[in-house]
Amino acid sequence: MAEKKSQKNTPVKQIDPEQKEKALAAALAQIEKQFGKGSIMKLGDTQALDIEAVSTGSLGLDSALGIGGLPMGRIVEIYGPESSGKTTLTLSVVAQAQKNGKTCAFIDAEHALDPIYARKLGVDTDGLLISQPDNGEQALEICDALVRSGAVDVIIVDSVAALTPKAEIEGDMGDSHMGLQARLMSQALRKLTANIKATNCLVIFINQIRMKIGVMFGNPETTTGGNALKFYASVRLDIRRSGVVKDGDEVIGSETKVKIVKNKVAPPFREVQFDIMYGEGIARMNELLILAESHGFINKAGAWFSYEGEKIGQGKNNAIKWLKEHPEVASKIEQDIRNLLISNPTFTATPDSENADNADDEFSEEEL
């Protein structure tokens, strides 16, 4: 028998730490030269941590989101039942963004935007870009073009359920188009995500709820458009109407509850409640009074409310009226509350985990 050749253990080459640092610096320099500045950086760098936010118009929701609003350069999904306040909340975001000089666009796939109502919510309709596309492909192409331009800061897509594929529109009633919309959304979001981050554009998708058939245990509710949006969204808001606001026997608004079911930029699972008044939108002063009282900025003794020792009104309605008549004081109180509740505006973003999403494997929606 031939003798077995003795195997020599080749020693692992040890790299000098100084040479390692030089090699890493050279590699980073080459990457930045080839792909541009900021293409790679350390997570602890200030640039990577600073997340610009757009206010939602609700002080409570802004604080619950952790960074003072919805994050720029990210995808956000807002979903809920019919007449729960989804469009009202997004129009409120548009109004706040426009106040800060941002350019906004509204892709109205449902063809149902009411400009009169939008103006009542504070939206500058003259400066708002609007598109009413014929099909889902056209809507998402328009969205992609606006994002790539770098000139639009906030884009609303209303809604995912109305993004009907061209093949379905041109087909006959009753034709089966299994998974067509899910594939459309998956392809579009793959293209959009990198461009959205590069141009620091906020894209909000409004979505509807459907019921799963045959679910015996667990939540039978699901959103339309497959699983892709659940994965790509940095923030997902579940908005519901929890009650009504009455003036005597007349219903003048609705009590609204929002649950943050996913948040990649701050801790998730927080809930907040506020009122949406018909023809007015989010009741900002009502919310401000409640938060100011609960955090000690406004004191209440009996039925009287007081601020810095001065009585501002007897009863809630009179106190709200006083705040509306003194916007500079209301603004100061709001800023004090923001400084207290949003103590770290540059909160470290969490990894790309799916938080609350018990979604199926990403490939499942691709195969539909």
Swiss-Prot record:
| SUPFAM superfamilies to which the protein is assigned, alphabetical | P-loop containing nucleoside triphosphate hydrolases (SSF52540), RecA protein, C-terminal domain (SSF54752)
**According to the UniProt entry, which residue ranges have a biased composition of type Acidic residues?**
354-368
Q: Where does ATP bind?
A: G80, P81, E82, S83, S84, G85, K86, T87
Where does the protein end up? Answer: Cytoplasm
- Alphabetized InterPro entries for the sequence: AAA+_ATPase, DNA_recomb/repair_RecA, DNA_recomb/repair_RecA_CS, P-loop_NTPase, RecA-like_C, RecA-like_N, RecA_ATP-bd, RecA_C_sf
Q: Known Gene3D superfamilies for this protein?
A: P-loop containing nucleotide triphosphate hydrolases
Keyword DNA damage carried by entry? yes
Keywords in alphabetical order, please.
Answer: ATP-binding, Cytoplasm, DNA damage, DNA recombination, DNA repair, DNA-binding, Nucleotide-binding, SOS response
Query: In what ranges is there compositional bias, type Polar residues?
Result: 344-353
- Gene Ontology biological process terms in this record: DNA recombination; DNA repair; SOS response
Q: Which terms does the record give in the GO molecular function aspect?
A: ATP binding; ATP hydrolysis activity; ATP-dependent DNA damage sensor activity; damaged DNA binding; single-stranded DNA binding
Classification via Pfam families: RecA, RecA_C
Q: Does the keyword Secreted apply?
A: no
Q: Quick one: where's region Disordered?
A: 344-368
Q: Name one GO cellular component term.
A: cytosol
Q: Write out the similarity annotation.
A: Belongs to the RecA family.
What is the role of the protein in this entry?
Can catalyze the hydrolysis of ATP in the presence of single-stranded DNA, the ATP-dependent uptake of single-stranded DNA by duplex DNA, and the ATP-dependent hybridization of homologous single-stranded DNAs. It interacts with LexA causing its activation and leading to its autocatalytic cleavage.
Per its UniProt record, what PANTHER family does this chain match? MITOCHONDRIAL DNA REPAIR PROTEIN RECA HOMOLOG-RELATED (PTHR45900:SF1), RECA (PTHR45900)
**NCBIfam families linked:** tigrfam_recA (TIGR02012)
HAMAP family the UniProt entry points to: RecA
Q: What is the name of the protein in this document?
A: Protein RecA
Primary gene name? recA
